């Protein structure tokens, strides 16, 4: 067939920024003849793959979308009344279109640079305010990964805050079953004993208690006396709860809970076969400095204006490392933003109306089922009824299946039904008809109004919420869609995301999130599948998971993989648990030491600690590589206690260490396993396969290498891939009842069987669109772009580390430490000045304090690279002006950066440089200028005066 008739597949050059001509120019500039020659210089021969990946060729966008549509069509959308922590919801269309589908929101990074993140920080502050208000507690964080992991985090927070010497954590049998299993997994690694029981029978001696309010199967209990009893023995009370129910029920903070956790999924976020959804945690003020996850706080900027920032960061894993009590890094920012905006959209009256409608429909259903002769076990309820259906259970289930209805199958003689905001009167009638058919009775025609008038409510008077909800004006100020649209635009305009400019963050891989990859995630066939629906309804998801798993195993060289971990840190944790389980199965439980290089990501030592391992740090040599002499000494020192070496490759210093295979051999000879952190996999896809050059296990960051967007701090997916001997110890997969089915090595690490399955189509689409050749080319160009930036900037800023032939991998570290002595200018000053040039800063002070790490990714074209390079060169000249004494050391464009419009329009200008230099340091900014909404934020003030809820409107006057 003529090539003119070949399908048009142009995705690869759309994803890869530099054109072929640009690549030639760049190669010439760095003194290299070809991309292949560059790889020969950069990648050690011992690890280089000898052949292409066994993956299909690149396909067109239309072909891949048609393929995914066919896969999605194999899922079967049923009416879901399963509940169990996952509920039907209506995503407001204005939020769907302008947030979830808007790259201004989904391509942003975690808001470490607050001056260019004020929009999403405000949206997250709304979320925190909403959660704290509804739970009746003092402070909320900005999201956790899901309800199950939030419960596990509550357990560790309780242990830190408890006055009890006990190692027992009591978990109510009324909790969601998947929550119980995730808590058990976490407890086992930490040496905590989980006592599962009915709290009505009394509490054992324990350091903490986890309750469910309302119960998983519907009941609503008054926990006041129980909370008092727990506190009397020094225990901390944690409560898993439902935000919608709390619109009508007494908040946990009022009846004695110290911590409240749960999922905000039903606030506008679809099922997605289990995720992603934003977990939440709120707590009393006394626990705030130990609370896990990001925390948005209010501070002020250099002009005295209110400004938001991430607060209390010194408690987090990237600071505390092995002393951290949580490994949370990426959370669920995009989903938390959606949930908070759901509350803004509906307002307090709307939320109460939704909750009341759900509750009244449940009361009507209870009355109708009682009329049919079904025993409803629980007299108290919000939205869930437990039914004794006895021998009629199979017939009722069959009748439901015939009507495409899912009920919760508790056991062979009981069913449960959970209602939600999507239920209509017609749905209620269909549900009643199903039970009548299963009982072989005539249909019962519902008179909704009559039943509503007669049916008693399910919330006891003593537990009915008194007073209003969502009192802050932000939840009452939006009246029309026009108002909402403009509010969302105002927030988005405050932020700098990939839709505006390159985000050169080292070790973060801020690459293109192509529109074609994003489209399938909102299709109903993917969005509306309940994670605990019968397996025959998720055939499409299972096929997608199988295909993606095989592709990732081929890319990495491993034998098996779990897609369950819903962040990179959770992938690390799961991988270390697999190693721990493997050693224990071999009768070597004493192997509990994890060696970690000093340059490792902060999540590495934090994850090792959570997995019950002792961390021993291995030094780096002068070239930034693992110090082999120190490694040998540490191997000798720990002896048969060695569990693993956890190493990032290419290293966090941005180089391919030549000795990696030798390092793996040394660890294996000592009886340990090699954990290779896959955070930098973007430098190896199609070029090297860690499972084939000595590693035993890796996690991948699908939100880095495989194009799931960062979402401003989540969602993420962190699959853990292993060689065959570790496969039996991958995370356990829960069955339809949310329990572990059969034998398994370890328990689950996430609440849903396949974690954040709803965003897996993104990575599948990326791999299919790129094909084997495109994936390799992406790696080649990522390495080219990094080396080009390093070569162009080397005369202005020393490049701290390089591999053989003076090359870097996919990122480079610019050493700006000498400038501190010569000019008083710090890495932070350069980072803030880059905002005036329209750029997000590189990674600051990691892995080396006082430096900047740059990762351009393959998606940035030559023009954008040159714009960044020009900015960095111009900034170096601005520093030189200070060094030469032409500008004041304390009053200069860097120390005062970023410059807001308010600063530049001030009537008096008292600075030692012209306004023009502050605003337009390069001519190109006159055509497209991003204005930071706030001046430099005062971090210390924010931590000294901690406020983590919305300020009164007057504060902004």
Swiss-Prot record:
EC number per UniProt:
1.4.4.2
Gene Ontology molecular function:
glycine binding; glycine dehydrogenase (decarboxylating) activity; pyridoxal phosphate binding
What the entry lists under InterPro entries is as follows: GcvP, GDC-P_C, GDC-P_N, GDC_P, PyrdxlP-dep_Trfase, PyrdxlP-dep_Trfase_major, PyrdxlP-dep_Trfase_small
**What Gene3D superfamilies has UniProt attached to this entry?**
Aspartate Aminotransferase, domain 1, Type I PLP-dependent aspartate aminotransferase-like (Major domain)
Q: Which SUPFAM superfamilies match?
A: PLP-dependent transferases (SSF53383)
Q: Which GO biological process annotations does it have? A: glycine decarboxylation via glycine cleavage system
Q: How does it assemble?
A: The glycine cleavage system is composed of four proteins: P, T, L and H.
PANTHER family assigned: GLYCINE DEHYDROGENASE (DECARBOXYLATING), MITOCHONDRIAL, GLYCINE DEHYDROGENASE, DECARBOXYLATING
| Functional summary from the UniProt entry | The glycine cleavage system catalyzes the degradation of glycine. The P protein binds the alpha-amino group of glycine through its pyridoxal phosphate cofactor; CO(2) is released and the remaining methylamine moiety is then transferred to the lipoamide cofactor of the H protein.
- HAMAP family, alphabetically? GcvP
Name it.
Glycine dehydrogenase (decarboxylating)
Species the sequence originates in: Bordetella petrii (strain ATCC BAA-461 / DSM 12804 / CCUG 43448)
